[in-house]
Amino acid sequence: MTKDVLHYDTVGSFLRPEKLKQARQEFLENKISREKLKLVENETIADLVEKEKQLGLKVVTDGEFRRSYWHLDTFWGFGGIEHTIPEHGYFFHGEETRADSATVSGKIHYVENHPDVQAFSYLKELIKDDDDVTARQSIPAPAQLYVELFRDEHNKKITNEFYPDHKKLVADISKAYRELILDLYNHGCRDIKLDDCTWGVIVDDDFWNVFSEDGKYTRDGLQDLYLKLNNGALVDLPEDLRITTHICRGNYHSTWASKGGYEPVAAHVFAKENVDAFYLEFDDERSGGFEPLRFVPKGKEVVLGIITSKKPELEDKEELKQRIKEAAKYVDLENLALSTQCGFASTEEGNKLTEEDQEAKIKLVIETAKEVWK
């Protein structure tokens, strides 16, 4: 694998096949064993990877088929974190998710054989004889775990009981994450993407007004905290490990959680986060314009999420090319790439598309990119 710019990509989660959905439900109802569920997961992941390769993707994922949520499953794999059921799920535009959370149960630390490492090991095995593709592992950003631990009054109370000194909390989260990243590396992973909704909350005035009510943070102060959490996990990593981040505004059942352009956070996250590339949502008016890209340091990559994963309708190819041209005013064209705005299934429910729609979106990404970057 090289760090050469690849001009087409996906965010990585894919619609769960009905066979997998049925098996997960049967497992929850104690009708099948965990071993049987794992066999179904393995089979459907193998089918997905073959499909990704057939479509022409050069970076493949397991579709997050072993996860229920894009973020919580990773949190639950750390020591000192437990799975809890809050009163409410996450609130999206016109919809509420299932109610699950992660709370502190002790000192947060990394535990060997983390579920994400197990998942990646199987993915790596599937492509071991194919030098033409790279296996990627997506994990939620360290800052996302911090936010979850202060998600509501219940979580805040428990977190403060275990961690009255928040500096120790920040240090433990970053350390646990760095050890996860290094363990993934030691198992052959050379491409890790941090999925991160924390910045999307800061840019949304409605979210920010609620979040800032306790007066503990200014917008700049919170951004400094998120950078410390994320960059703290990314220190002294191997040179041949590619680290990227996807900045998201929520993606559940084709709905969204937050809105706002990147301007309020661009000078922090674009200029200072220690990643190789930013996967950014620009699929509708909620995302604002490309002007904040002026803060991206020269040489870093930006993957333009201008093809929505929330709706089946296909974008006009010429309009996509024009938008790429507009973005190139702020980032060199050779450092730009194209992808869908988010994954197709950030949770196991998935967005309101068919697998055929999903495939058509990916084909549009690849075809458009090949015409732009000839």
Q: What is the predicted role of each segment?
A:
Residues 1-374:
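Domain-level signal for soluble alpha/beta catalytic cores
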